[in-house]
Amino acid sequence: HPIRIPFTVPSPSGPVPRFVFSFLIATKESLVLIDAGVHGSEQRIFGEVRDLGRKPEEIGFLVLTHSHPDHIGGAMAIQEATGCSIAAHPAERKWIEDTQCQERERPVPGFRDLVGGPVRVSRLIGDGDSITLGAGRALQVIHTPGHSSGSISLLMRPEMILFSGDAIPVPGDLPIYDDPDASIESLERLMNIEHITYLFSSWAEPKGGEEVYFTMDDGHAWVKEVSRAVSLITVAHPGIGLDHLTRLVVKEIGLPAEAANPMVIRTIKAHTRKS
């Protein structure tokens, strides 16, 4: 059950509207929540739970695909209200349990408004692990680094529904990832999974059928397009500074000037390390 959560990020030109998806999986005994949205998202999530005829207290397990604010922001309030266990990849644990550290190391505009506070990760999960849902169903953990070092995707079997977190960039949207090579490798790994029926991404509306693989192809092409633009501009402007490079790349790939924010600067820096 997808839950679309709108929020805004401050910018010099005013608030920028964004959204993120969380997902509920209902089992007979309890509810599993994938990602917690931003601070305050618990109200929307709990409302969706009640609309399903269930109670928020039935959320027994929260799986975090990674540690960024729009995925962990509501986790503290959700855990306080439900007592749920929280699972994440070991590489994401530090920033989930120490949000002040995350703010220092990865400053995001409006961070303190987006994140309710830290939470303790009670279960560490990695590539190949399985989260049992009951009735023969399970979530297979797939390590998909790139967006962040510990990003995970989840494949629900036997339905073959893929929850990809932020592993699949959206063409025309802000390119946000820490390692372009790892992002490409993760995308290719997901693209090689056969018979995916539905794709539930945090950044885009749910997709089914052939659209699943078209979406992955498009994300793959977007990372390649950013890489092309970085290479083109660094060759044309040897010794160019990072901020100036980012502004030129943003223009080259067709994004507005305000897209050259700290998160995108971080992405472009990663591409220069690749070069």
Label each PLM-derived region with a short phrase.
Residues L232-S275:
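C-terminal regulatory/interaction regions
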Residues L24-I25, G128-M156, I161:
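Core dinuclear metal-dependent hydrolase active-site scaffold
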Residues H39-S41, S67-I72, R93-I96, S149-S151, ...:
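Active-site environment of divalent metal-dependent phosphoester hydrolases
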Residues A81, A182-I240:
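Divalent-metal (often Zn2+) His-rich catalytic cores of metallo-beta-lactamase-fold enzymes
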Residues G40-Q43, R50-G134:
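Active-site HxH/HxHxD metal-binding segment of metal-dependent hydrolases
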Residues I34-A36, I59-S67, I86-P90, H143-G146, ...:
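Active-site neighborhood of phospho(di)ester-bond hydrolases with catalytic His/Asp-centered motifs
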Residues Q100, D173-D178, F214:
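Short, solvent-exposed loop/turn segments at secondary-structure boundaries
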